[in-house]
Amino acid sequence: MPFSKLGRNKSQRRALLRTLMTDLIVQEKIMITESKAKELQKLADKMVTLSKKNTLHTRRQAKRHLFDEKINDDTTVLQKLFKDISSKYLDRQGGYTRVIKTVPRRGDGAPMAIIAFV
């Protein structure tokens, strides 16, 4: 499956997507460039599919793509993914996120988009 390099090498691209994926789970909606949103959408849909299985193996697979930091005193990012987000989509077979195009960025005119969970 082809993917966008996002103007970065492999390690930088992984770190960027990992940070964006963590932010998306915490905030449930973020505004980023259109190309980053399209790449993040692929990863986010895979993560929700993993979280619906809810086994030890899928938790470890999901942890590879997240920074498992604390959101508040009780919850971590991984717990929010596996408890809150996956429970919303138990009867849904895919298409967990939506990319909405917005106005270009003011400084350089880069096409922007909002990615959010449906």
Curated annotation (Swiss-Prot):
Q: Which Pfam families match?
A: Ribosomal_L17
Instruction: List the record's Gene Ontology CC terms alphabetically.
Output: large ribosomal subunit
Q: Does the keyword Ribosomal protein apply?
A: yes
- Spell out where the chain crosses the membrane: none
> What would be an example GO MF term here?
structural constituent of ribosome
Superkingdom of this entry's organism?
Bacteria
Entry keyword NADP: no
- Sorted UniProt keywords: Ribonucleoprotein, Ribosomal protein
**Stored Gene3D superfamilies:** Ribosomal protein L17 (3.90.1030.10)
Family assignment?
A: Belongs to the bacterial ribosomal protein bL17 family.
Q: What protein name does the entry list?
A: Large ribosomal subunit protein bL17
Which organism is this protein's natural source? Onion yellows phytoplasma (strain OY-M)
